[in-house]
Amino acid sequence: MYTYLMVIMLFCIGVVVTLTSVPMISKMLEKSDMIRANYKGDMIPVGLGLVFIPTLIINSVILIYSNIVPEKIIMIYMLLFASISMSFVGIIDDSLGNRGVTGLLGHFKALFKGTLTTGAFKALLGGFVGLTIAVTISKSIPNIIVATLVVALSTNMMNLFDLRPGRAIKVYTLLAIIIFIASAKFQREVMMLILPAVLAYFYFDLRALTMMGDAGSNVLGVSLGVFIVSSFGLA
């Protein structure tokens, strides 16, 4: 049953878990030489988007335990699957990515020449994740096509915004608020699985203390896509 208490509880837990996770994951990445120069030339840890995953999992356990409706539980698992998958491919790109190939077109040109770049791998996996989400929520071919594109393009959009500290999170938060207001009650609870982590991490990103990398921007984009297709009649 929807209650404002559940939303508040998930929000508070998400903030606490994220603030606890940031220093630990930051230190882990530093020890693994996951360090990169930011736009000012300062060397900071990259891949801090991983901090979104602990909050997502913990809050998902709570929300799944409190619900017995299969359709609602499926929605939670969709977000879990999409976010963990794209965070996984994101951290691969952050750690192994070839910066000599840029842009979606550049990655696919390399792919057509027989070279699989991490960027192309990310784009392909994003497309298949979008397709998986789409066929889960709809059996209508037109809706499946639209939903797949929404999820895939949302992921790519957040990558494009994540070029300066705080920019991607600002855009994400604005769009998430709009979706939150327009969504049904349970969708709002689902949004609380990830939104608190994003807001709690915002300070570190805005101050350029850490870089969330593709491990984070992918999660922002794909979660936004899941929220859109599950909230606006694409089933």
Predicted regions and their residues:
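"…together with the soluble PPM/PP2C metallo-phosphatase catalytic core" -> "…together
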Residues: 2-235
